[in-house]
């Protein structure tokens, strides 16, 4: 496995796909990086030379916020919204969806497993 900015890239994948294992690098950014460094996207990670790895690392670290820096920035943005008391911060604090999704049904990923509420009974048929 080639190690790039603290991430082990899978050896047998194409470079364009393997770069997406880095937090903050998707398919578009991976393609742009390969075009800027002049490396073929069809190349496998195991076929990379040391010079190409250095070129990729320099380009990624020099032009983009990735991995730890990006994670810290996102966490700081959320913390700031919570501290200033914005609506988004309130939703983060309560563990609810932030971007306006419905919560009457769904939203289970954010809310967690269902909690049964005592006292609710179904109306009986007469």
From Swiss-Prot:
Provide GO CC annotations from the record.
cytosol; small ribosomal subunit
Q: Name one Pfam family in it.
A: Ribosomal_S13
Would you kindly state one Gene Ontology biological process term found in this protein's UniProt entry?
Answer: translation
Fetch the PROSITE patterns from UniProt: RIBOSOMAL_S13_1 (PS00646), RIBOSOMAL_S13_2 (PS50159)
Xref: InterPro entries: Rbsml_uS13_C (IPR027437), Ribosomal_uS13 (IPR001892), Ribosomal_uS13-like_H2TH (IPR010979), Ribosomal_uS13_bac-type (IPR019980), Ribosomal_uS13_CS (IPR018269)
A single GO molecular function, which one? structural constituent of ribosome
The annotated region (Disordered) lies at 93-126
Q: Which UniProt keywords apply?
A: Ribonucleoprotein, Ribosomal protein, RNA-binding, rRNA-binding, tRNA-binding
The record's section on PANTHER family has: 30S RIBOSOMAL PROTEIN S13/40S RIBOSOMAL PROTEIN S18, SMALL RIBOSOMAL SUBUNIT PROTEIN US13M
Described function: Located at the top of the head of the 30S subunit, it contacts several helices of the 16S rRNA. In the 70S ribosome it contacts the 23S rRNA (bridge B1a) and protein L5 of the 50S subunit (bridge B1b), connecting the 2 subunits; these bridges are implicated in subunit movement. Contacts the tRNAs in the A and P-sites.
Family statement drawn from the similarity comment of this UniProt entry: Belongs to the universal ribosomal protein uS13 family.
Q: What name does the UniProt record give this protein?
A: Small ribosomal subunit protein uS13
- Per the UniProt record, the source organism is Beutenbergia cavernae (strain ATCC BAA-8 / DSM 12333 / CCUG 43141 / JCM 11478 / NBRC 16432 / NCIMB 13614 / HKI 0122)
High-level lineage: Bacteria, Bacillati, Actinomycetota, Actinomycetes, Micrococcales
Gene that encodes the chain: rpsM
């Amino acid at each position: 496995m080639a190690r790039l900015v603290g991430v082990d890239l899978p050896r047998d994948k194409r470079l364009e796909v393997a770069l997406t294992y880095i937090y903050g690098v998707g398919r578009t950014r991976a393609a742009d990086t390969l075009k800027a460094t002049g490396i073929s996207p069809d190349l496998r990670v195991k076929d990379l030379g040391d010079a190409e790895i250095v070129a990729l690392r320099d380009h990624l670290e020099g032009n983009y916020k990735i991995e730890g820096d990006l994670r810290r920035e996102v966490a700081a943005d959320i913390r700031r919204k919570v501290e200033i008391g914005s609506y988004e911060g309130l939703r983060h604090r309560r563990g609810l969806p932030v971007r306006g999704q419905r919560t009457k049904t769904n939203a289970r990923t954010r809310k967690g497993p269902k909690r049964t509420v005592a006292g609710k009974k179904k109306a009986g048929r007469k």
